[in-house]
Amino acid sequence: MGIDRNCMDQPYLVGRMVAIIETAIVVPSGFAHKVTVDPKGYTLNYYLDKAIAKGGDYADDLMMLQSKAGIASRSLDADGQYWIGYYNQRADIDRKRIGQQIKDRRIELNYSQQYLAKMTRMTAATISKLENGRWSASVDMLSRVASALHLELNLD
């Protein structure tokens, strides 16, 4: 069974995540280790992120697995090898969750990204990056966005 390109099969992704986590050998060091990785494992991380962004019945389970296990971050070397360093991706998950909440509220208020950008003194590109979880926002930025969206910023 291949990876579901449309991220429709979230139970399959949960199963694959558990299988990967159970077989991973974590070396307790602060360094990355150069290893050869099956490209399907690399692709799984990409589609897992898409499945989480899509939501659904298993989105919370997928996020929990990612955050508790410290899924590997990967970068491809020129020679086709991956450097794998383990770290906790909670910040990545939080950025995506916050971004989705911003986007949902903006759409609920019928604001365009350009209008929200003008209200917050940011660029539309920055708003887009925030909504897609590709920008680590400062508290000041989040405060301005929350104010523009008529929300209260809660840092709990």
Segments and roles (model prediction):
Residues 100-116, 144:
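Short basic helix-loop element that most often maps to the first helix and adjoining turn
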Residues 110-128:
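Short alpha-helical DNA-recognition segment
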Residues 138-155:
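DNA major-groove recognition helix of helix-turn-helix/homeodomain DNA-binding modules
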Residues 1-92:
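Intrinsic-disorder/low-complexity detector
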Residues 16, 20, 86, 106-107, ...:
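Residues within alpha-helical segments
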